[in-house]
A protein has these predicted regions:
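Transmembrane-helix boundary motif in ABC transporter permease subunits
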Residues: 3, 77-107, 292-298
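Membrane-interfacial helix termini and adjacent extracytoplasmic/periplasmic loops
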Residues: 42-61, 118-168
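Interhelical loop and adjacent transmembrane-helix boundary motif
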Residues: 234-282
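Cytoplasmic-entry segments and transmembrane alpha-helices of multi-pass inner-membrane transporters
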Residues: 12, 87-122, 304-306
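Membrane-cytosol interface at the C-terminal ends of specific transmembrane alpha-helices
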Residues: 86-91, 142-195, 199, 207, ...
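Transmembrane alpha-helices
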Residues: 109, 113, 117, 174-178, ...
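Transmembrane alpha-helix signature in integral membrane proteins
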Residues: 61-91, 220
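C-terminal transmembrane helix and the adjacent membrane-cytosol boundary/short C-terminal tail
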Residues: 179-183, 187, 261-306
């Protein structure tokens, strides 16, 4: 009994220390970034968030193009990846066991591909395809340039191409969560839905997804967090222009690609501004996590769970 009690206390202490270490590391990252970016915040204040200037020679800096680029590419990635992940998950779960297993492994392998490989594929394969076929089809045939924020000028690079790359990269993460949600749904729910005449689409959309909405939201926010911080793949295809984009086909930049492009030779005020961009990115990621937990809490309360 004494040995068991002692081991429980040791285990509790170790777990507490690990949990505290996570909090200390997170706080340490944030404090270090704030301290390193203090010169930028004292010089520009909140104006840094709304300025689009970027002229290191005259010490004019603005984070708005990077923030907009990060947000737009992430939204494009989610809009593309979510329906694909949902359709792939449904097919994998409903397919014969061996077929579903092979397809599941194939989707999971996408997560194992290094981001630099995605970037090279985007540079040498996707960007030329975008310039020659996809973007002309979207503009000339579908006439999508009439939609706000879809411009008629394109060169294969830009926000849309970066969003497509990110969609492929976050697809396996969202798909894995959705597969688990679909597989954990009690069979009686499906049988009841089919029994009252629901189609397969209606059963999955109105019954199963609602039952596993917490898992679905978790998968969405996992993909969102993954897309926000991606650097190398985006760096290859976004165009790396420190200008405010006028459309999704414009070359632009993201926070992470701005850091990768400028940090090596930056010093003085520019280095402090780059640390400030790191603070902004960290706050965006923390905001996503807080929002996801809030959504899950609200959903849990609506379902009457404790």
């Amino acid at each position: 009994m004494r040995v068991t009690l002692k081991s429980d206390n040791i285990f509790k202490t170790v777990c507490l220390a690990c949990g505290a270490a996570v909090l200390i590391l997170t706080a340490g990252f944030f404090i270090q970034l704030l301290w390193a970016s203090s010169e930028a915040w004292s010089r520009f204040g909140l104006e840094l968030l709304v300025s689009s200037d970027w002229d290191p020679g005259n010490e004019k800096f603005g984070a708005l193009p990077s923030i907009v680029g990060t947000s737009v590419t992430t939204v494009i990635a989610l809009l593309i990846a979510l329906p694909l992940a949902f359709a792939a998950s449904l097919f994998i779960v409903d397919a014969p066991k061996k077929v579903g297993m092979i397809l599941g492994y194939a989707v999971d392998l996408l997560a194992a591909i290094p981001s630099v490989i995605y970037g090279m594929w985007g540079l040498f394969v996707l960007a030329p395809l975008m310039q020659k076929y996809i973007q002309p089809f979207m503009v000339n045939t579908l006439q999508m340039d009439k939609i706000p924020f879809v411009n008629s000028n394109y060169n294969g690079f830009g926000l849309f191409t970066a969003g497509v790359i990110l969609a492929v990269m976050i697809l396996p993460y969202i798909c894995a969560v959705l597969r688990d949600v679909l597989q954990m749904t009690p069979p009686v729910l499906k049988e009841a839905a089919y029994g009252i005449g629901c189609t397969k689409l209606e059963a999955n959309k109105d019954i199963i997804l609602r039952y596993g909405i917490r898992g679905v939201l978790g998968g969405i926010f996992i993909g969102l967090g993954r897309a926000l911080g991606e650097t190398m793949a985006v760096l290859f295809v976004i165009g790396n222009m420190m200008n405010m984009p006028k459309g999704i086909f414009d070359s632009a930049t993201t926070i992470s690609s701005t850091l990768a492009n400028n940090f090596a030779e930056a010093d003085g005020l520019q280095r402090s501004v780059l640390f400030a961009l790191g603070v902004i990115l960290l706050l965006m990621c923390l905001g996503i996590q807080i929002t996801s937990q809030s959504f899950l809490h609200v959903t849990k309360a609506k379902r009457g769970e404790k």
